[in-house]
Amino acid sequence: MTMQGKIPRPRGNVPRAIHLPLTRRSLIGAGLAIVGGGLGLASRRADAASGRLLFAGVNLAGGEFGEMPGTQGKDYRYPATADIDYYAELGFNLIRVPFRWERLQPTLGTPFVPADQGQLTKVVEYAAGKGLHVVLDTHNYARRRLADDGWTQDHLIGSKLVPTAAFADYCGRLAGIFKGAQSVMFGLMNEPWGMESEDWLVIANAAIAALRREGAQQMALVPGVAYSGAHSWVSARNIVMGNIVDPANKFAFEVHQYFDADSSGTSPIAVGASIGSERIEIFQRWCRQNGFRAFLGEFAAGADATSLAALDDICRTLEANSDVWLGWAAWAGGTWWPDDYIFTLEPSKGKKMRPQTRILATYARHRASRPN
């Protein structure tokens, strides 16, 4: 997901209540004990050999919405139990939960806000009880805002005001809370942009080191720069991310891929029925050649025939290449989307299932595994 206005923006037409920063095109308690499936190398290899993806999920947007810092329930919200129930009942086994670093930790280097930490904890616990894994998605684009300048300026991670050590501290605190939750995966950062891949590599390695120092052994999902586009992985020089250092050796590369003309996800119109599969191919080949695993953290389609065909096609491609892909999370669920949002997966006002959701649910029911 890209950014616009004053905070991370939803793709396409934006709900009025959501004010977001910088479009892609304008600047272009304590450890949880949760029963869940582990993500060991042996199990990943077994599923790859069987031609089965581990994860089929959806993004549940809302925690990244609104003015900064915002008020929970007014400017932003975390997934409710009913949101999780809807997708669990359709057969999905994963949710990706976007939220803002600033809301968990308004002041760098300090303990998390109990209310926001508590809400995320409830989401993880409830989802695990429903058999769903949770990707914790720090939805900040490799930058954050500070109270000192009235929450108006975006400061890159690695800058003087937001040093890499501050991000590592944040990641370590997140790990300390959720290291006992085996259903959790740590999405290091949503769609980094505005920096060189070499600089992002240093930051990502510091984040992973912080996770592992705190004892978190779950999967880390590592994005690249240039919004972590699969289509631009090589051209953006994200191949340098092959130098990731993970003492636990439990990481995968997270990429995003949209089907519109410029891969921005700002139009619902797919440019071809196989465009998604075509665009991920070069990244997929790089992963296979280098022995890496991957996760498609965002993709979406409109409701026209070509776009729906492209959605079905990419799901089939991911499944056919399960030696590379761990799984996927489609964009986007979340009950704060307006009924006419171009990529909503929520039921229509008439309670009718969206055609996109129907396609995704078919793959989720037939292909995805559940936590042990």
Feature roles, as predicted:
Residues 20-21, 41-54:
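C-terminal segment of N-terminal export signals and the immediately downstream linker at the start
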Residues 6-35:
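N-terminal secretory signal peptides and thylakoid transit peptides that target proteins
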Residues 51-236:
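Active-site mouth of glycoside hydrolases
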Residues 316-317, 321-372:
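Extended, alpha-helix-rich binding/interface surfaces that flank or overlap catalytic cores
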Residues 76, 169, 176, 180-185, ...:
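Extracellular glycoside hydrolase catalytic/binding regions
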Residues 36-40:
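Hydrophobic h-region of N-terminal signal peptides that target proteins for export
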